[in-house]
Amino acid sequence: MKSIVFMGTPQFAVPILKALIDSEDYQVLAVVSQPDRRVGRKRELRATPVKELALENGIEVLTPEKINHSPEMDRVIELAPDLIITAAFGQFLPDKLLAAAKVAAINVHGSLLPKYRGGAPIQYAVMNGDAETGVTIMYMVKKMDAGDIISQASLPITKQDDTGTMFEKLSLLGRDLLLDTLPKLLAGDITPVKQDESQVVFSPNITREQETIDFTLPADRIDDLVRGLRPAPVGNMVIDGLRTKVYDVTPLTETTDLQPGQVVRVEKHALIIAAGAGTTYQINSLKPAGKPKMDITDYLNGHQNLKPGVQAINND
């Protein structure tokens, strides 16, 4: 039985950790996760999903604010596991910590590296309208997501997917890929592949500016951005003078000569908006500032000024 220290934080890492806990081939000695954070309107202190799973299974949990030069790092080194496995941990790991693994320190990353190194690979894949994405297991090195590739698996992104659904799918794909890869890695049957630095694409964390959707883009690009920013932080536009979160849109085949942001037509249950390149889309659900999330029917009841030709969406 090989010993593991697992390092992860969000829900993405939970199925991966659970599979290792449930396996008879591995013993999880300890779990390292981010500290408890205050969340929600009530600012309640909440443990990470990974920490909760570890505690449910009686596993030692370490939660350093910063892992480098910490007592928690010393504890991992003391444990001297066969493997250190990370999945969306959220901190850089120093060389001294990586060297504590007797066999290897590896990472489960939510993209097909070298595309989308960084903290938001799944969001960027959806936002950019990629046809597929996947999971990479690679050796950990000091440079971000730059280690040699051990194994990869891919899956398609459909137009019904958003970042939430892809997180779930890639988490399960990562779990299955890891369980398939570890025996080969431990047996020495893996030939790692260096990443092609000329093909590197970065996916830094989403900024506040990126949450504002450019309404002059073609409808299919607007749809990609809406889905890529859902379920959080949710993209926004200024609609009828109010900053409004846009949860769901549908690109249409209908074309128009109207300018982006203008109302094409209003139906009982539909608001059709002009987008870039003569394309159109339908807004399905949204949340104006200071109001609850609502479907378009309820929204239109309070915005009867929106008529064909009206400039419904502006920059501010």
From Swiss-Prot:
Protein name per its UniProtKB record = Methionyl-tRNA formyltransferase
Q: Which cysteines are joined by disulfide bonds?
A: none
NCBIfam families on file: fmt (TIGR00460)
EC number(s) stated in the UniProt entry for this protein: 2.1.2.9
The organism named in the record is Limosilactobacillus fermentum (strain NBRC 3956 / LMG 18251)
Cellular component aspect of the GO annotation: cytosol
* Record CDD domains: FMT_core_Met-tRNA-FMT_N (cd08646), Met_tRNA_FMT_C (cd08704)
Listed InterPro entries: Fmt (IPR005794), Formyl_trans_C (IPR005793), Formyl_trans_C_sf (IPR037022), Formyl_transf_N (IPR002376), Formyl_transf_N_sf (IPR036477), Formyl_transferase-like_C_sf (IPR011034), GART_AS (IPR001555), Met-tRNA-FMT_C (IPR044135)
Alphabetically, the GO molecular function entries are: methionyl-tRNA formyltransferase activity
Q: Which HAMAP family match?
A: Formyl_trans
| Pfam families the record matches | Formyl_trans_C, Formyl_trans_N
Family of this protein: Belongs to the Fmt family.
Query: Gene name, please?
Result: fmt
Q: Which UniProt keywords apply?
A: Protein biosynthesis, Transferase
Signal peptide, first to last residue: none
Q: Does the keyword Transmembrane helix apply?
A: no
